[in-house]
């Protein structure tokens, strides 16, 4: 098991223990080379807690000891006093940091901060030193649902990560920004009862490669088609897209109309001249400000977000939610963990920077309207009927719906309503 996966399991256990004690905390995992593997601050944890958790994790990783045990060793004249004196403030002798070991060797340090020292120590030690064995319903056991496996395949010049499970006709699920295949995690068990499900990480997302280019939706759709062709599943697919995944799904269906039996396009406009009509500010508050912000090519988005990935993902998701906390801390950590890699952080913005190329491609695609049945979905608290109104021009057989009492994240905010709608349409 790789260190990032282990770190996510530890963070899940910290979340469970902090919830049990009703103490919101920050948790950081740092490897023995001083690199941040994962960092997350729960809602309600003090602003300073993230920095202190990092110091505790750094200290435990490099010293190989509990920070609570360091107090007598860092007093003036003691063995480790010079360590604190020259550390520039990065070391900490406050309880709440513990080393993470594998086969008796220290592989990382874990730091927790947000409560009293005693609470921080209790939470981190319950999570790392004496964790409850993960059961079939425990938070550490179910990142990939039962009946599914996570795999990789080389497709042309990229490696595509994907989750596969279930049995039946092929159902392909394409996620949006800043998500990964994990967007569909809660729905996968139900989908798997009727379909062979393929949920990939798009080029530049999750555990898929993040190359320098290829983020136009025509190329990203070709990645998915190549994957399905390798798997022998390209014929007669049902295809569902959300957000950026909607743009990729459309490009896929337009390029291979005879291979797609049903198409779902949800909560995203398709790149065409209509994009310029979306305001960044509305009478109800912020509009599509992110389209312009992400499209900056001078590195501004990357520079602002680097080092704040967890906060960025949590707050960005929150701005588009009607049902707050529909996407929880574990999901935020999952998405943010991949953005710590500069190539993946940049790739997410390249999806938006490619819109001019997408517009040119779609101007050709729209000359032949989609022949398959298309379900176009908007959310009442987000795009509403803008989605079906636009898709009507692209398809010959379109059904449009608006999910009530819902924000942009329709698959997490109204999962049961969405499941029923998709069951009716996809069958």
Positions of predicted regions on the chain:
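Flexible "cap/lid" subdomain of the alpha/beta-hydrolase fold that forms the substrate-access gate
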Residues: 138-152, 157-160, 170, 198, ...
